[in-house]
Design a protein with these regions (language model features):
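Family-specific signature for flavin-dependent thymidylate synthase
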Residues: 1-259
Length: 259
């Protein structure tokens, strides 16, 4: 799953999410001191420490983490990833590039699954030939006057896409926890680990492993007999997981930076 890029479109949202979370928590205990809007704004502007963020984020009261949304862009992930990630609907909004309104003739590209990337060249060629054939047939259908929506059914699941995801901090943590588990598909794990890595860089406390990672990092596996029996270290941050589980991607990233 190379050439997948992620970016947080409103980095300021992380800071606002922390501030709103602390403010909402404080409000529950200071209602008797607020007589007017000026009092409320004084409470809103009160400073706070990272320890305060840590304490509140660890409480079983998710509502305080729902007063801000963080918007993330994903470029290059497949439409199969789109089908999987959009199962999450609570407090999440999506906007995707459209097969109906976009003409991919001559512009389409397809993602290469990590399992194919690791395989012999012969296997890689079989996969690439199959995807390219689908894209060629799509372009041929469009050239014959078939509308883009109908022709889109001929495209492969691996067709690269552009996706915007907007969610509350609490829901981001829920999605990351669910989708970075080693029982998920490689592409979904890679994308969500990349997103987590960016969120963690901006707020290592709010998105700490013990608050954001899969079940095995936050306690113990809850999959029972479906467990992978290969728990992730509780000390690992997202970059550590990427290095351990997807070393080929890391090597390619390092190589591209050198070039």
């Amino acid at each position: 799953m190379d050439y997948i890029e992620t970016a947080i479109l409103n980095c300021y949202g992380i800071r606002e999410a922390e501030q709103n979370m602390v403010f909402a928590a404080r409000l529950t205990q200071h209602g008797h001191t607020i007589q007017n809007m000026a009092d409320l704004m004084d409470l809103y502007r009160q400073s706070y420490s990272q320890k305060t963020v840590e304490n509140i984020a660890g409480l079983p009261h998710p509502t305080v983490q729902k007063f801000m949304v963080i918007t993330v862009a994903v470029v290059g992930a497949s439409r199969r990833f789109l089908a999987q990630i959009t199962r999450h609907q609570n407090e999440v909004k999506y906007m995707s590039a459209s097969l109906q309104y976009s003409n991919y003739s001559g512009h389409a590209a397809f993602a290469i699954p990590y399992g194919i990337m690791k395989a012999d060249k012969e296997i890689q060629d079989i996969y690439k030939k199959s995807c390219q054939s689908d894209l060629d047939h799509y372009a041929e259908l469009c050239a014959l006057g078939i509308d883009h929506d109908s022709a889109g059914y001929a495209t492969p699941q691996g067709l690269r896409n552009v996706l915007i995801i907007s969610a509350t901090p609490y829901q981001w943590k829920h999605m990351i926890s669910q989708r970075t588990c080693r029982r998920n598909t490689d592409e979904t794990r890679i994308v969500m680990l990349q997103i987590w890595q960016r969120l963690y860089k901006l707020s290592p406390i709010l998105f700490a492993p013990d608050l954001t990672g899969p079940f095995c990092q936050r306690g113990s596996c809850m999959e029972k007999q479906m467990s992978c029996q290969n728990p992730i270290s509780k000390l690992w941050i997202p970059s550590d997981i990427l290095k351990a589980d997807y070393p080929l991607l890391i090597r390619r990233e390092v190589s591209s930076h050198k070039d």
